């Protein structure tokens, strides 16, 4: 039916000259992509490690960490991802034009913007963690004790919020310069440190210790 409609799909062919011309660019993109995924995914990998270790703790520990992380992800997603997404094309253009002064100014403004919004978010979550968790989850099988234990995990996680947001911003200059090695080195160090702190803090503070290690 597609042939009868005279629709030309030659542009999808690997023999298409346009595809061949883009082969080098595509290869470079894929080379840069893998480290970027690992560099940006360090937080999620740390969270996965937390969940695995939480499975060895009393029932409910995984849920406490998961719900606390969902709440903590809201300002992280809104601020960190939004700022980094807006910064990347601007910074890439400055790098392309070799405009170091404007590039540094853009980075500085983004960092200031991230701090201005993340610190109040941290304070708000710290002061209202119990109320936030109770409002969102205190119903059905989710008891008052569950709410308290989840709010403790949220309180621990929120202290890392400014750093989480700044990380999203600070990796942008490296990606704009096509340097994916530095972020991945930092990510590997971060994940190693998180694992060590997990093993130390889990004994005394249980699931809250895992949240502290992540922060």
Tell me what each language-model feature is:
Residues 1-215:
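Membrane-embedded alpha-helical bundles of multi-pass transporters/translocases
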């Amino acid at each position: 039916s597609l042939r009868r409609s005279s629709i030309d799909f030659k542009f999808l062919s690997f023999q298409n000259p346009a595809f061949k011309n883009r082969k080098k660019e595509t290869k470079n993109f894929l080379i840069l992509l893998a480290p970027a995924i690992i560099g940006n995914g360090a937080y999620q990998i740390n969270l996965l490690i937390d969940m695995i270790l939480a499975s060895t703790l009393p029932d409910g520990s995984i849920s406490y960490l998961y719900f606390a992380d969902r709440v903590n992800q809201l300002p992280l997603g809104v601020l960190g991802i939004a700022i980094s997404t807006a910064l990347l094309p601007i910074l890439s253009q400055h790098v392309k034009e070799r405009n170091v002064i404007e590039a540094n100014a853009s980075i500085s403004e983004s960092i200031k913007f991230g701090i201005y919004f993340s610190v109040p978010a941290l304070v708000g979550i710290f002061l209202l963690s119990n109320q936030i968790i109770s409002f969102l989850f205190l119903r059905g099988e989710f008891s008052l004790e569950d709410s308290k234990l989840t709010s403790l995990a949220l309180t621990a996680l929120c202290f890392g919020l400014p750093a989480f947001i700044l990380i999203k911003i600070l990796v942008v200059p490296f990606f704009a310069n096509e340097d994916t090695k530095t972020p991945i080195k930092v990510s590997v160090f971060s994940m190693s440190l998180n694992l060590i702190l997990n093993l130390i803090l889990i004994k005394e503070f249980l699931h809250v210790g895992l949240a502290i290690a992540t922060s």
